[in-house]
Amino acid sequence: MRVLGLISGTSADGIDVAIAEIQGFQADLSVALLAFETIAYEPSLRDRILEVAAGFPLSVAELTALDAAIAQAFATAAQTLIQQHGAVDLIGSHGQTVYHQPLQAGQLGWSVQLGWGAAIAQQTGITTVSNFRSADLALGGQGAPPVPAVDLWLLGSDSENRCVQNIGGIGNLTWLPRRDHPDWQSEVRGWDTGPGNSLLDLAVQKLSQGRLSYDDGSQWAATGQIDQVLCDRWLQEDDYFRLPPPKSTGRERYGWQFLETWAAELDRLTAADQLATLTEFTAASIVNNYRHFLPALPDRVLVCGGGLHNQFLLQRLQQQLPTVKIASTDDFGVNSQAKEAIAIAVLAYWRQHNVPGNLPAVTGASGPALLGDVFART
C-alpha cells in the first residue's frame, strides 16, 4: 500500500511529507521510502502557530480558523508530492501540536493537534487518518511519543541494545532491547527526554533580533563557553528530570517561558555562551534520562530529527556517553529526516488494517488502542 505521512514538529519549521510503500505489519513490516520533502509554512501561519504554542490566547473562532488554515496547508503539501510522485492509497496526518497536557493526578490528559483531518480527506479525495494521540490518552496513557511501536520493528537489533533518539523541538527516545530473549517486546520503552532544538532555536531568534531562526551548523554555539554551574542548576531544579516514565512534555515547559524564567542568569552571559550552555543542557537532559531511567546504557544511539545537523550537540552527547556508539538512523536504513513522517504513515496503515499502534508499556495506557480517526473521502 502506498501511504503518505504528514507531520509538523513542535518547532513548526514546516510540514514533513513522506510517501512510502508499506507491506506487512509487525515482524514482517517493510517500509520503502519513495519520496520525502519538507514544505515550509507561510511565515504568517508559522507565526500564528508559535504564538498559540507559547500560550497566546485565542477565541474559539480564531482557533477553529487556525485549525482550518493548517488543514489547508497540510492538504496542499500532500497534493504537491502526489503530483510529483504519483497517487497514494491513504494519508496519515499527525497535524500540528500546539498544546500537550499529559495525565496528572489521576485526570485524563489531553493533547491538541490542529489540522482538520476531514478537510484533508475532502480536499485531496483520499481517505485520511488523523488524531493519533486521543485513543491512548483516553486509556490513561501519555499519548506520546507516538512512534516507538514503529521503531520497534524497523530499528531493533538481535545483537545490541539501542536507543532511537529523536531531536526535534522536543527530544524523545525509544529504548530497544536486544531481540535475543522471549520478552524483549515487553521491555521496549519510550518517552520525551526534554528539550530538543526548542530552547536553542528560540534563543537564536532572540539573540539575533529575529534575523535568524536557528544556529546553522551550530557555528555560533560552538564558539561559546559552557556555564556548567547554570546547566547543573537547570537539571537539579527541573522536576521533569526526576519524573519517572511514562512521561511526555512540550514547548509549554521548554519554550519562551523557560527562557524568560532564567533571563537574568542568561543575560549575564555572552550570546555564544548562552547558546553553548543551552546546548550542554539539551545534551545533559538526554543523558540524564538514559542514566536514571534505562535499565542500562545503550550500546548504540541512533539519532534522527533536525538535531542531527547540530554537530556541537552531537559532540556534547558523545562527550557525556564515551562508551556509546552514536550514529544516525540513516546508517540503519531509515531516513533520519523523514522518520517521523514515515512513522505516521505506518500508524495510518495499521489503523486502516485494525492493528493497534500504541505500546501500553511505553505510554502507560491501560491497553492497546487503534490510533487515529478515519475520514473517508466522499
Swiss-Prot record:
Positions that bind ATP: G9, T10, S11, A12, D13, G14, I15, D16
SUPFAM superfamilies xrefs: Actin-like ATPase domain
Annotated pathway: Amino-sugar metabolism; 1,6-anhydro-N-acetylmuramate degradation; Cell wall biogenesis; peptidoglycan recycling
Keywords: ATP-binding, Carbohydrate metabolism, Kinase, Nucleotide-binding, Transferase
Protein name in the entry: Anhydro-N-acetylmuramic acid kinase
InterPro entries found in the cross-reference section: Anhydro_N_Ac-Mur_kinase (IPR005338), ATPase_NBD (IPR043129)
Function: Catalyzes the specific phosphorylation of 1,6-anhydro-N-acetylmuramic acid (anhMurNAc) with the simultaneous cleavage of the 1,6-anhydro ring, generating MurNAc-6-P. Is required for the utilization of anhMurNAc either imported from the medium or derived from its own cell wall murein, and thus plays a role in cell wall recycling.
Pfam families listed in its UniProt record: AnmK
